[in-house]
Amino acid sequence: MNIGTLILCPWDLSLRNLFLFFYLFLLSKILFLFAEIEMPVLHGDIAVADTTYKNAEPCTATEKGCKWPKEGRYVYVPYYISPDYKEQNIIIRGMRSFNQTTCIRFIPWNPSVRNYISFFTQPNSGCWSYLGRQKGVQHISLERGGCVRYSTVQHEILHALGFNHEQVRSDRDRYVRILFNNIKRKQQYNFQKKRTNNLETPYDFSSVMHYNKYAFSKNGLPTIEAKGDPAPAFGNARQMSTNDIIRVNKLYRCSKLKTYSTFYLLCEYV
């Protein structure tokens, strides 16, 4: 949609023209905000800005520049949910799970706030998020018809808070084998090991951030193989694990760390 250009001559600055000028200016900003969003995606569902190509490994490794700011005991994250969703309750439940188990507090966005996350859906937009806090509006794509699931909402929010996928942890080779011969060539970068801050927590096969064993397979064979006997199942988490919650509390230095069982979360949110 194109906005016509309004030319104000210096001798015709009537209140009516000034009002029309500012109306068109604000309308153009709103249309830009909700215009079609196309972002390069790293690690399957992690978006990176065209200008910086920043990803989250340095964020959680250095804890500088990627965390949302803390005010007192809490970390307030403003959010906006597109009215295109009929499933807003699922997104709200996902955010509420952080309010219940961590010091993260999701609060409705108001226009005076510059930094916030915005959940949106577009045809073929898929599921993705930025890694760590960005400046200004920070989009989280949850395409209707496939991405608006409780576990996916938690997964993408964890990216926005600064967390990477489990299977790219710096110590992953002790727990899994990455079968590169079975991975689509253009997707192999998704499995490269990264420098991560593991926050003194163990590798977690039950993490909501773990890929499943056939992720990006080119031939129907596994791309990730768990070590151990018996080999643990992984990649189909219905929600955040206990370790996922503990990591958020540690990274953001929440004052009272608690252990939340999977049973508690299932009873609370199913």
Predicted regions and their residues:
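Zinc-dependent metalloendopeptidases
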Residues: 1-17, 26-270
